[in-house]
Amino acid sequence: DEAKTMLGRTQGNIQAIRPLRDGVIADFIVTEEMIKHFIKKVHKRSTFANPRILICVPTGSTPVERKAIQDSALAAGARRVQLIEEPIAAAIGANLPISEATGSMVIDIGGGTTEIAVMSLGGVVYSNSLRVAGDAMDNALISYMRKEYNLMIGDSTAEKIKKEIGTAIPSSNNTFLMKGRDIRSGTPKEIELTEKDACEALMPILNQILGGIKEALENTPPELSADLIDMGLVLTGGGALLKNIDKLISQDTGLPVTIADDPLSCVAIGTGRALE
């Protein structure tokens, strides 16, 4: 979080880098250093720690992308590296009964990807990975501000808008005082944004997620589809915290939608349980 707040604010000789983008490695060297840092935080007393590591990957990641992740972890000092697909980890963390003979559907809206999966009897019946999620929402807000208000804003400001007034269905008169740089004059400028503005900016991304969910439902076997009427759909990931996103998905699919307890931590919790 400390590094994230530095995005767009660093000195000329300092560069803020995202090691991962869209759920896969964007910078091999920085990813290796990041994993080394995490290992040191866990094994504070051991200089020669070489732990077993379990890493989540998007279901749509390629064999090359998966190997790159494993290679980074091994280079960082891991003794053994295993991979788990994100929706499985999310479902475990959300306490879904994936080992039972009933169908469960999880929608994990993370930073780089949205993972959609239908599971039953401990396996994945259908999965889809969309490379649109929280980061794409931020980019949509940046583009909207530029197009509608000639205002240039950064990633951290876009994320703040998303958290403050971002919504899938406008339901209040909440506003947000937006500050940025006027593209034409180059001077600082501020405008007042409404929930309706934020929703309009986010809707193209939300429509892609809705399309992915519909595709998953169309590819679900009839027996499991019947289970989903009772079980509903479960949302995890930071994107699940977007206001009214559960209502939007429920309206679009006609199915009950619930947000998991502590959606931000579901993938991490599920990965930890799987490692045990």
Q: For the regions a protein language model found, what residue spans apply to each?
A:
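Nucleotide/phosphate-binding catalytic cleft detector across ATP-hydrolyzing
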Residues: 1-109, 117-234, 240-276
